[in-house]
């Protein structure tokens, strides 16, 4: 029987203290679990941080991860997003270097068409911000790679996710 790997998303509320991020990420490393992304930030309560963890694993490994997180003293609450509608986005910056004036005009056109934000530019470069799903960000990277061959730099932040307010019609 073949082990089926699935993309997963977990949210964990943790104590907002020095060393908690290292301990939680160490928990994953110590068990040889690989994280796709890990994003952490302070919540509306300054004593808590919220982690969004993306990973690809089989069902058994996923169960073990949830149990490990729940056993950790610093973890206040774990939310398994597997079977719930969520809103999830990733921050992406794309910098295009060695731009001519025509390139800049094209980048501004792309930004307007795809609802991207030009956050900075100078005579030679343009910096675009994209906050979309991982899949749509991958499409943006492919588009910019094709149009501006060997002239782009990409920086990605991890995903952040929250329970959706409504279930989308499918």
Show the residue positions of the predicted features.
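Long, contiguous binding/interaction regions
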Residues: 1-49, 57-170
